[in-house]
C-alpha cells in the first residue's frame, strides 16, 4: 500500500515528500515524458502498477522486510509480491538517481507534460 511504499522510500534514505509532486509522473496519475531519471522512476512505477490491471495497488498491503540494506518482498500471494516488487524497484531507483533530483521539477505543472511516452 502507499504507506508501505513511503516507508520503503524513507528507509532507503530519501524523503517520501520529495516525490509527491515531482515531474510529470511522481504523485497521482501521470502524463507526458519523464523529465529526468528521478521522474523516470515514477514513470516505470506507474507502468508496473498499470500491468497489474484493476488490482488495488494503492491500498493492498503486502509482506516485506529490510535486510542488510535491501528490501525483501516475502508475500506468498503472487499479486501482492508483484505489487511489493513494483514499490521495491521504485524505492531503490529513487535512491540510485538521487543525484538527478532537480528542485525545479518539484510542484511541476502537468500542463507542461504534453509529450507522450508508452510503457
From Swiss-Prot:
Q: Which SMART domains match?
A: PA2c
* Active site (catalytic residues): 45, 87
Q: Which GO terms describe its biological process?
A: arachidonate secretion; lipid catabolic process; negative regulation of T cell proliferation; phospholipid metabolic process
Post-translational modification here is noted as: Contains 6 disulfide bonds.
Q: Name one GO molecular function term.
A: calcium ion binding
**Where does it reside?**
Secreted
Catalytically driven reaction(s): a 1,2-diacyl-sn-glycero-3-phosphocholine + H2O = a 1-acyl-sn-glycero-3-phosphocholine + a fatty acid + H(+)
Spell out the InterPro entries in the cross-references: PLipase_A2, PLipase_A2_Asp_AS, PLipase_A2_dom, PLipase_A2_dom_sf, PLipase_A2_His_AS
Q: What is its EC number?
A: 3.1.1.4
Its keywords, alphabetically, are: Calcium, Disulfide bond, Hydrolase, Lipid degradation, Lipid metabolism, Metal-binding, Secreted
Name a GO CC annotation attached to this entry: extracellular region
Record note on cofactor: Binds 1 Ca(2+) ion.
**Which sites bind Ca(2+)?**
25, 27, 29, 46
- Pfam families on file: Phospholip_A2_1
UniProt function note: PLA2 catalyzes the calcium-dependent hydrolysis of the 2-acyl groups in 3-sn-phosphoglycerides.
> Which family does the UniProt entry place this protein in?
Belongs to the phospholipase A2 family. Group II subfamily. D49 sub-subfamily.
Any extra remark in the record? Two very similar relatively non-toxic phospholipases were isolated from the venom, CM-II (shown here) and CM-I. The amino acid composition of CM-I differed from that of CM-II in having 1 more Thr and Ala and one fewer Ser and Lys.
Entry protein name: Acidic phospholipase A2 CM-II
Organism, as annotated: Bitis nasicornis
List the lineage, top down.
Eukaryota, Metazoa, Chordata, Craniata, Vertebrata
Amino acid at each position: 500500500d502507499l504507506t508501505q511504499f513511503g516507508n520503503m522510500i524513507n528507509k532507503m534514505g530519501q524523503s517520501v515528500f520529495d516525490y509527491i509532486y515531482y515531474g510529470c509522473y511522481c504523485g497521482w496519475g501521470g502524463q507526458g515524458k519523464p523529465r529526468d531519471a528521478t521522474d523516470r522512476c515514477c514513470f516505470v512505477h506507474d507502468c508496473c502498477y498499470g500491468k497489474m490491471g484493476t488490482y488495488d495497488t494503492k491500498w493492498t498491503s503486502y509482506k516485506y522486510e529490510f535486510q542488510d540494506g535491501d528490501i525483501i518482498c516475502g508475500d506468498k500471494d503472487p499479486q501482492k509480491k508483484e505489487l511489493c516488487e513494483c514499490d521495491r524497484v521504485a524505492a531503490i531507483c529513487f535512491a540510485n538517481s538521487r543525484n538527478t533530483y532537480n528542485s525545479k521539477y518539484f510542484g511541476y505543472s502537468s500542463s507542461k507534460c504534453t509529450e507522450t511516452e508508452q510503457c
